[in-house]
C-alpha cells in the first residue's frame, strides 16, 4: 500500500534541549554552514547517502524522499546556561573560531529559553538559567507554552524536539511509568523521584504534536506511558542514546565475529572524555545510565542463549573517565579476546581517537529530519526503523509476538 506523505512545506522548528551544549552547537553550526555552502554535511545520511531506483540509477535520498530542506529549519531550545549559540560554541571548543564566524550572526540570534532542570538528576551541573516550577506538571505546562510561543514567533509549520542534553541519573522502570494515567498523576503529585526533567520535555512535545528524539540513555520515552501517549496523539518518538563512537565500532565488529562464528571471551572498553558530558558521567549515578546502555549492545548481537559455546560467558566491562584536558576529543580503547578454530585465542586492540560531537551532530540532524518525515507520513509511536542511529534502540513490547511453548 502506498504511504501518503504530506509535503514538507513551511518552516520546521527544531527545539533542542541542551541547545548550548557541544553536540547541539556543533549540529547547528554545521547545518547553517552547509546551507551557506561553507561546509559539507559529512556523516549525514539524509544529506549525502544515495538510494537505488528501479532502473538501477542512484539518487540522493533527499532528492527522492520528501525531507525538509535545511534552508527551512529554524533552531531554538532550552539550556541551563544563558549563553547564545555563538558563545556556547566558543566555550565548547569543538569547532574553530573561523568556522563559527561564517555563521556568527545566525548563532548570536539563537538564545536559549530557561531550562526545566533538577540538580538531583545531574549533580555535576550547576546552571542558573532555570525555570521555577512548583510541580513537574507545572514544568510541563511551561514547556508546552514555550513550544507554542516559539512556533508562533518563528512562523513554523511543524516542530521537532530533540534531547541533546546530559545523561540523567539511572532509575528503573516503576509503576508510575506503566500507564499514561499513572504518569500524569505522578507529575501532578510532583513525584520527583520517578519523574525526570526529560520526561517533562517528552510529554510537553508529544502534547503539542511534536516528535520527540531522545539522544541520551535516560529512561524517558521508552516507557509504556509514553508509548500510550504518543499513539494517542499520533506523534512519533525515537531513541535512545546516539550511537556515535566506541559503540559504533562495537556494532561493526560484533556482527563480523558472529557472521564468522568466532567466539568472544571478553571485551574491555574504556574512554577518556573532557567535555560537560564527561563531567556529568563522572558521577556514578549518571554513569550507570550510560553503562547499562553501552553494555546492552553486544548481548543483543551475539545472542548468547543461541550460541552458548561462542558467547555464553563473555566478560564485558565498560568505563568512562573524565579527563578535562581532552575536552570533546574522546579517546576510546577496546581490548577484545576472541577465539577461533579449535578454541585457539587471539586478541584485537582498537584505539579510536575521535571527536565526540563531530560524530554525534549528523546523527542528531538525521533523527530530526526522519522524525519530521515520520510525522508527515502519519507514523506514530516508537520509530523502530531509526534504531540504526541508537545504542539502545527502543521497541514497543506490545508489538512483539511471544509464541506459546
What are these regions (language model features)?
Residues 398-405:
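Residue-level detector of conserved catalytic or cofactor/ligand-binding positions
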Residues 15-18, 22, 228, 246-384:
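Active-site-lining helix/loop region of Rossmann-like oxidoreductase modules
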Residues 39-40, 155, 376-379, 394, ...:
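Residue-level signal for secondary-structure boundary elements
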Residues 25, 221, 322-325, 388-392:
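Generic structural "secondary-structure junction" signal
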Residues 373, 385-398:
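C-terminal non-catalytic interaction/assembly regions of soluble proteins
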Residues 2, 10-19, 23-251, 255-256, ...:
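N-terminal Rossmann-like NAD(P) cofactor-binding subdomain of oxidoreductases
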Amino acid at each position: 500500500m502506498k504511504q501518503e506523505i504530506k509535503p514538507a512545506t513551511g518552516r520546521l522548528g527544531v527545539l533542542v534541549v541542551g541547545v548550548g551544549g557541544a553536540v547541539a552547537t556543533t549540529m547547528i553550526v554545521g547545518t547553517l554552514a552547509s546551507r551557506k555552502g561553507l561546509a559539507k554535511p559529512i556523516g549525514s545520511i539524509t544529506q549525502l547517502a544515495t538510494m537505488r531506483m528501479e532502473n538501477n540509477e542512484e539518487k540522493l535520498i533527499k532528492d527522492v524522499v520528501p525531507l525538509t530542506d535545511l534552508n527551512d529549519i529554524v533552531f531554538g531550545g532550552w539550556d541551563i546556561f544563558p549563553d547564545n549559540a555563538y558563545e556556547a560554541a566558543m566555550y565548547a571548543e569543538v569547532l574553530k573560531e573561523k568556522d563559527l564566524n561564517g555563521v556568527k550572526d545566525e548563532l548570536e540570534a539563537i538564545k536559549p529559553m530557561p531550562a526545566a532542570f533538577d540538580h538531583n538528576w545531574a549533580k555535576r551541573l550547576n546552571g542558573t538559567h532555570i525555570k521555577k516550577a512548583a510541580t513537574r506538571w507545572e514544568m510541563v505546562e511551561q514547556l508546552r507554552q514555550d513550544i507554542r510561543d516559539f512556533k508562533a514567533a518563528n512562523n513554523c509549520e511543524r516542530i521537532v524536539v530533540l534531547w541533546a542534553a546530559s545523561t540523567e541519573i539511572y532509575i528503573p522502570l516503576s509503576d508510575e511509568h506503566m500507564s499514561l494515567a499513572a504518569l500524569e498523576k505522578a507529575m501532578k503529585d510532583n513525584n520527583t523521584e520517578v519523574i525526570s526533567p526529560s520526561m517533562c520535555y517528552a510529554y510537553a512535545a508529544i502534547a503539542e504534536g511534536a516528535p520527540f528524539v531522545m539522544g541520551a540513555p535516560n529512561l524517558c520515552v521508552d516507557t509504556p506511558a509514553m508509548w500510550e501517549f504518543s499513539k494517542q496523539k499520533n506523534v512519533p518518538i525515537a531513541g535512545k542514546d546516539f550511537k556515535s563512537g566506541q559503540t559504533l565500532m562495537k556494532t561493526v565488529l560484533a556482527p563480523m565475529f558472529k557472521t564468522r562464528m568466532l567466539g568472544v571471551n571478553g571485551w574491555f572498553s574504556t574512554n577518556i572524555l573532557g567535555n560537560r558530558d564527561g563531567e556529568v558521567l563522572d558521577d556514578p549515578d549518571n554513569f550507570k545510565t550510560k553503562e547499562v546502555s553501552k553494555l546492552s549492545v553486544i548481548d543483543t548481537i551475539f545472542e548468547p542463549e543461541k550460541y552458548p559455546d561462542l558467547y555464553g560467558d563473555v566478560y564485558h566491562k565498560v568505563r568512562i573517565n573524565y579527563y578535562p584536558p581532552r575536552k570533546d576529543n574522546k579517546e576510546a580503547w577496546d581490548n577484545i579476546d576472541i577465539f577461533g578454530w579449535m578454541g585457539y585465542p587471539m586478541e584485537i586492540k582498537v584505539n579510536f581517537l575521535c571527536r565526540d560531537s563531530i560524530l554525534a551532530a549528523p546523527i542528531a540532524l538525521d533523527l530530526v529530519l526522519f522524525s519530521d518525515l515520520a510525522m508527515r507520513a502519519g507514523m506514530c509511536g516508537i520509530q523502530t526503523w531509526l534504531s540504526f542511529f541508537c545504542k539502545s534502540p527502543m521497541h514497543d513490547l506490545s508489538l512483539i509476538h511471544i509464541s506459546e511453548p
